[in-house]
Amino acid sequence: MAENFVVVDGGVVAPKGFKANGHKDRKYGAALIYSETDAVAAGVFTTNKVFAHPVALSKDVLVNNSVFRAIVANSGNANCFTKGGMDDAKLLVKKAAELLNIPENQVLSASTGVIGRRMPMDIITTEVERAFENMSSENSNKNASAAIMTTDAFPKTIAVEFEVNGKSVRIGGIAKGAGMIAPNMLHATMLGFITTDIEISKEDLTNSLQKATDESFNNAVVDGDMSTNDTVYVLANAQSGVKYIDCKDKFDSALAYVSKELAKMIVSDGEGAKKLIEATVYGAETKEDAKKASMSIIRSLLLKTAVFGADPNWGRIAAAVGYSGAEMDMSNFDIIISDISLEKQAILVKSGEQIADCGTPELKLAEEIMKEDKIKIIVDLKMGSFENTAFGCDLGYDYVRINSEYTT
């Protein structure tokens, strides 16, 4: 049980009226997500000024259309910064629309992979055809998730369910991402595709997605690089018979949870990563300060390597907060290293005073905690009432190996 909803199986096909499938042959893959009835859609995208052709195409489609039925995505090629890239993006959409027998302007698209290389459209369209062949497969959600992987080590998927007046509402999602993760999506490569059977307006869905994204994907950092292709979509087809207006808080909470869990899976799968890091900053003067400080901790390469080496070098945490731009008083703040369940907590700095030093019980406890797969860093700035949690991972030898071998 998570708050007022439960986790269920099925990912993007858990909500009523959705089908999906994917196929991947070595380097290249494709995934399809399809609503059997008309749906509304919302999307958020990278703010990188160098952006991929499917980002440009789908932004335009979202603005100019109100009915959507499908998402098509390919892996192995980012379709970014290439001559003819927009034609290739449109051809990908056309192929999906033809197979699903729907208008092209009802299809959203996304790509992930190598930047600056022309799309091998004969291979990509063949993968779309293979994905379409078995949209009712028992493994359809898993296939779709696996098809969009590049350097990912595992598929990322989740679904939740909650009840409203005796009726069930479901939200399901898949995502990919392992490197180039430092999204900042408003209106890595990180892709997220979410489905729901709630009845909701485009405006409300957009607002809910933007809030969920800001709490989740925009708080996730693997290596600090912002991709040209970062994209998150939500399709809502109203098949549950439940209206958003009757469960606004429940839906927003559930969508935020799904988004956060997908974000955590992404950073847990950071290229070569072994450990998940959560950094929570309390007591900030503003929400912006809380985010600055927590993201600064997660972005710190020195902190990431310290976590990799299980070294509770809390000075790197203090330094990261200090240069973050957040208001703070170095004579009055706390630093704690904890396990993810908060059962074990090592207080390293209390009210600006050093507690942990060589040989102290606090430092020994911190060393023990740092050996775990998931750790939490807590900072209390004691300046106000705002807080934020950011997600990241350690940085080790394999990150260099993977990225030195992967053509970008």
UniProtKB/Swiss-Prot annotation:
Superkingdom of origin organism: Archaea
Site, Involved in the stabilization of negative charge on the oxyanion by the formation of the oxyanion hole: residue positions: 112-113
Keywords: Acyltransferase, Amino-acid biosynthesis, Arginine biosynthesis, Autocatalytic cleavage, Cytoplasm, Transferase
Residues that coordinate or bind substrate: 150, 176, 189, 271, 403, 408
Record pathway: Amino-acid biosynthesis; L-arginine biosynthesis; L-ornithine and N-acetyl-L-glutamate from L-glutamate and N(2)-acetyl-L-ornithine (cyclic): step 1/1
UniProt cross-references to Pfam families, sorted A to Z: ArgJ
EC number(s) per entry: 2.3.1.35
Catalytic activity: N(2)-acetyl-L-ornithine + L-glutamate = N-acetyl-L-glutamate + L-ornithine
Keyword Lipoprotein: no
GO biological process, one term: ornithine biosynthetic process
HAMAP family: ArgJ
PANTHER family: ARGININE BIOSYNTHESIS BIFUNCTIONAL PROTEIN ARGJ, ARGININE BIOSYNTHESIS BIFUNCTIONAL PROTEIN ARGJ, MITOCHONDRIAL
Protein name: Glutamate N-acetyltransferase
Organism: Methanococcus maripaludis (strain C7 / ATCC BAA-1331)
Gene designation per UniProt: argJ
